[in-house]
């Protein structure tokens, strides 16, 4: 039985309690199903709740898929899922809180904190200019000078009501919605039917909230491959939604195979679990081919695990063997900076669209703040392929219906991988090297930045 059923069961118990107290709302809800009957039991209340959430009966609700129950919760509550649920990273799911009091917990910064001229300092002494504002009450702050591209926030963040206290022209809800667009003409390809349908990609990362409405339809496989140590994180949903989310994704129709794996064990870095995950991905690739489907085109990994920097890690030999097997099967393992001969370090770079820019216009893109200053390395600029890598709206990590604006972003890798999936829709035998070469040939060169990928021209070239 799905863990979400308990949410509906709790609501039915609450309805019975209120009905017995003759509360008007509870009585009215029951009358819509049972008329003026007074001898109603918990079973009857369960039936009422099931009907209200779009099911014909309680039995139908209980037998529904987990994601169908999640979708029913959100659709019926009109995107106000303030339900008593908490994230369980072990199963990529949400469970009822023990006390049944789960709500959206807004945080408020202490008075006097400067949210405009902000620098985040980590325990190791490193700094970040990006400001975390997720689920925070900012209604009393003057944020008129805030750089909206330097802050993370979500659709539960409370902004000042007065426009004068927000950045000029900034409407939070509109901005979040606009930034779901992957950009650079990707949606024009979707309109042509080039959207990843009948293709597949895999992701190896940490925690993933499996049932998020942005990508649950695409998620064909979820498996945890590690020692079972506690885990957390936000990047899994960001990667999947940027790659194959139905509104945020570059390849919104692609199948996704997700493996949750630890990078460390007993405080030591290990590649063992990533290697196991990649071997399983190779097995799934072969199974898809036997079923007459396309194989898995690409594996998206944030960690630069194939780099020489990590060659002495625990499990490195197993990982190298798995990467070779994947390559022999035609699967691109996209991990860290690409390491092609002649340009081993700076072959790719992240760009983002200006706050008031046109997401489909490469002229409105700039290099991300934490990227190499390409103007200082003119010999590399023409060999650097740039992808959108920040300033994007992606799926949130703790609520099934929430979205967040990710300023620093992890979306370079999923953008690359998603575009590779689209490219293979046109040329199924495309290699990573060909993808990169043609991307450089068809992209839009911008001095001091590099070659900004042009998805439409890339696809046109592949069509011949």
Walk through the language-model features, giving the residues of each:
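Intrinsically disordered, low-complexity eukaryotic regions enriched in glycine, serine
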Residues: 1-82
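Protease zymogen maturation seam
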Residues: 83-198, 213, 460-463
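N-terminal domain-start motif of subtilase-like serine proteases
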Residues: 171-201, 224-229, 285, 363-370, ...
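Subtilisin-like serine protease catalytic core
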Residues: 187-223, 227-274, 292-296, 378-381, ...
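Sec-exported extracytoplasmic/periplasmic mature domains
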Residues: 190-194, 244-248, 279-287, 304, ...
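Substrate-binding/access-modulating region of protease and related hydrolase catalytic domains
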Residues: 196, 262-351, 403-414
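Extracellular S/T/G-rich loop segment that most often corresponds to the catalytic His/Ser-adjacent loop
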Residues: 205, 328-331, 336-425, 429
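Caspase-like cysteine protease fold
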Residues: 447-464
């Amino acid at each position: 039985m799905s863990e979400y059923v308990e949410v509906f069961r709790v609501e039915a118990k609450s309805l019975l309690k209120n009905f017995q107290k003759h509360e008007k709302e509870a009585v009215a809800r029951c009358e819509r199903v049972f008329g003026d009957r007074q001898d109603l039991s918990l079973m009857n209340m369960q039936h009422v709740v099931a009907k209200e959430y779009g099911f014909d009966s309680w039995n139908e609700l209980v037998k529904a898929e987990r994601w169908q129950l999640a979708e029913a919760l959100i659709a019926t509550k009109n995107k106000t899922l303030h339900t008593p649920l908490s994230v369980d990273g072990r199963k990529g799911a949400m469970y009822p809180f023990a006390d049944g009091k789960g709500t959206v917990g807004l945080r408020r910064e202490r008075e006097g904190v400067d949210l405009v001229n902000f620098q985040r300092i980590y325990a190791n002494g490193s700094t970040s200019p990006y400001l975390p504002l997720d689920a925070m009450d900012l209604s009393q702050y003057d944020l008129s000078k805030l750089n909206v591209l330097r802050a993370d926030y979500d659709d539960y963040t409370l902004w000042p009501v007065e426009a004068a206290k927000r950045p000029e022209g900034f409407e939070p809800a509109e901005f979040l919605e606009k930034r779901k667009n992957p950009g650079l003409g990707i949606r024009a390809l979707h309109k042509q039917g080039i959207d990843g349908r009948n293709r597949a990609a895999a992701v190896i990362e940490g925690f993933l909230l499996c049932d998020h409405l942005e990508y649950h339809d695409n998620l064909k496989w979820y498996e945890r491959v590690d020692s079972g140590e506690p885990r957390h994180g936000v990047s899994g949903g960001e990667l999947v939604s940027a790659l194959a989310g139905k509104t945020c994704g570059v390849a919104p129709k692609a199948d996704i195979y997700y493996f949750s794996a630890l990078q460390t064990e007993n405080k030591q870095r290990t590649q063992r679990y990533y290697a196991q995950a990649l071997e399983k991905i190779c097995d799934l690739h072969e199974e898809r081919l036997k079923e007459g489907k396309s194989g898995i085109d690409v594996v998206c990994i944030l960690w630069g695990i194939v780099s020489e920097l990590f060659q002495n890690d625990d499990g490195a030999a197993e990982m190298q063997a798995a990467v070779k097997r994947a390559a022999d099967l035609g699967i691109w393992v996209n991990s860290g900076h690409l390491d092609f001969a002649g340009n081993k370090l700076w072959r790719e770079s992240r760009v983002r669209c200006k706050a008031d820019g046109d997401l489909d216009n490469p002229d409105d893109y700039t290099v991300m703040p934490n990227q190499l200053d390409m103007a200082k390395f003119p010999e590399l600029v023409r060999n650097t392929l740039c992808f959108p890598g920040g300033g994007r709206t992606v799926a949130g990590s703790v609520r099934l219906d929430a979205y967040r604006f990710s300023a620093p972003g992890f979306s370079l890798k999923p953008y690359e991988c998603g575009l590779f999936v689209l490219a293979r829709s046109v040329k199924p035998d495309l290699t990573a090297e060909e993808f990169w070469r043609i991307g450089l040939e068809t992209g839009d060169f911008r001095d001091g930045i590099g070659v900004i990928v042009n998805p439409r021209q890339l696809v046109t070239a592949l069509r011949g």
